[in-house]
Amino acid sequence: MLDCLTHQRHRRLANVDTTVVLRALAICTIVATHMRLRFVPGGAHTLLAVVGFNLARFMMPIESTRQRVRAGLLTVARVAVPTVLWAWSGWFLGASYGIGTVLLLNNYLGPPGHSSDHWHFWFIEVFVHLVVIVTALLAVPSIRQLVRRFPYGFPLALFAGTLLLRMEWAWLGDWYNIRFRTHSIAWFFVLGWLIQPSDSTYKRLVTSALCVASIAGFFDYPPREWFIGVCLVTLVWFREVSVPRVIVWPIATLASASMWILISHFTIWPSLVEVMPLGWAYVGTLVAVLVWFVADRVTDATCALAGRTFAKLPVRRRPLVLEPATVATA
């Protein structure tokens, strides 16, 4: 009888990659917060740590420098090009974007206040900047050798260094923007990188302590800090989580579409509010999933064509930090 119940439970559950669940959860909280459905901040910074984790997971093992650089640049292109085109279109149609937004440099060139549209793509800017920097660093043979020799020690030292960039001397005149500028939140990215090689109990304990200690007080808003901390500590200890099988597809879809939802929800939702009741306007934000479905196919074809044209190397169908869901029977 017990075996039968256990078997039924296993049939109802599936193991899903924790990063996929976190990406789906993060994008839901981002949209809910921005669209005033519910104030659940912390999703974007959680997503940034997941980017660092997945970059370490998928790009670090690539031995060929040429192939690693190409993989990193393709990852950047798959995110930067759609964002630039979307921002340029919005600028042309009247959104209050500036040239800094279109060039993905608003974090440093834009106005200090966050009440305007200029800062809509701050996360994408940080993503692009950090992936380019890490790709360039790993192309240096001596640094690559250090990473290979000290897979945990190198990101640990880098994490300590990036913590210095969040201090008052690096605020660049605006304390609030420390939460959004590349240099001052790079430590979230590196923290995700550090989580990936935490493969022993001792390392996991150290990394968990660093997660809690570094996040506490950074935002001066405990609920946001708790949300990010719980998400990252979960990733430290669980590389897969069990979820009801019926929600695996929605989770995987939201995770896969997260970039396009992030890019487009600022434009789609306000437009729908003007012509639809508020509740339906929120549901209508799922239009971003359809945008992703179409754009992803176009991007796949473009990247495949670029790969055949410029190099005889295999082209990954997905960017390194946006892997599809890993699902297994529980």
PLM features per residue range, with description:
Residues 1-163, 173-174, 178, 257, ...:
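Membrane-cytosol interface segments of multi-pass membrane proteins
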Residues 16-26, 203-212, 262:
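Short hydrophobic alpha-helical membrane-embedded segments
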Residues 25-33, 134, 158-166, 187-191, ...:
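Hydrophobic, membrane-inserted alpha-helices
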Residues 37, 108, 195, 267-268:
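Flexible, active-site-proximal loop/turn residues at the rims of small-molecule/cofactor binding pockets
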Residues 51-54, 132, 136, 186-194, ...:
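Specific aromatic-rich, kink-prone transmembrane helix
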Residues 87, 185, 189, 193, ...:
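Alpha-helical transmembrane segments of multi-pass integral membrane proteins
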Residues 139-143, 197, 241-244:
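Juxtamembrane helix-break-helix junctions at the cytosolic face
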Residues 168-223:
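Aromatic-anchored, glycine/proline-accented short structural segments
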